[in-house]
Amino acid sequence: MKINQVVLIRHGQSEWNTLNKFTGWHDAELDKKGKDEAKFAAILLKKEKFFFDCAHTSLLKRAIHTLQYILDELNQTWLSVKKSWRLNERHYGALEGLNKDEVIEKYGQKQVLLWRRSFDISPPQINIKDKRFPGNDPRYSHLNIHDIPLGESLEKTAKRVIPYWNKIIYPELKNNKKILIVAHGNSLRALIQHLYKIDNKAILDLNIPTAQPIILDFDNEKNPIKWHYLT
């Protein structure tokens, strides 16, 4: 692995992916396919002799467990891992837990696609009295209640992801650390859009598959050059 690379991986398939539900901040488990995907991602990394100095993931178990499977396969379970809510999936608001086909039937394909893929359009917000509100979860008890999302666009997701990149991850890259980030489709989309200056219309077409390693290439000054999937 070159020192000027960062590896991104979306978590493996979850039980709610299989059920075709909007997952967001719901803490869905990996299903069997997702576990196998995580192990296969590690095999791809091992084949190319990737080795990491540090790893980052979200506070959601589908990402945490994907990372654990990968580190186990790479014989790096001892690696220091930083977990942050800032790498969580975007919050799907009132859509969380709903079947995507049923939502499409109710609101239409065009509207749902905008909620899912556009840059600045948020889904309907959740009410703080709703049992699904993350403020009820002890893992977010350290957050100011005003920082806990009620429903996010990609733009809002980026506003929490990018500061984490700038303050925590990028200094590690500047220090020549080899970095692995296991997170979620939209938190990774937000990061890729920011680094590679993808415009707000083009980002609509970017859909990141589960457990497919993405290699970010940087020049010697640690400026992003290109990105590609490891296959």
Swiss-Prot record:
Keywords: Gluconeogenesis, Glycolysis, Isomerase. Gene3D superfamilies: Phosphoglycerate mutase-like. The keyword tRNA-binding does not apply. The active site is at 11 (tele-phosphohistidine intermediate), 89 (proton donor/acceptor). GO terms for molecular function: phosphoglycerate mutase activity. Substrate binds at residues 10-17, 23-24, 62, 89-92, 100, 116-117, 185-186. It comes from the Bacteria. Pathway: Carbohydrate degradation; glycolysis; pyruvate from D-glyceraldehyde 3-phosphate: step 3/5. The record marks 184 as: Transition state stabilizer. Homodimer. Catalyzes the interconversion of 2-phosphoglycerate and 3-phosphoglycerate. HAMAP family: PGAM_GpmA (MF_01039). This is 2,3-bisphosphoglycerate-dependent phosphoglycerate mutase. It comes from Buchnera aphidicola subsp. Acyrthosiphon pisum (strain Tuc7).
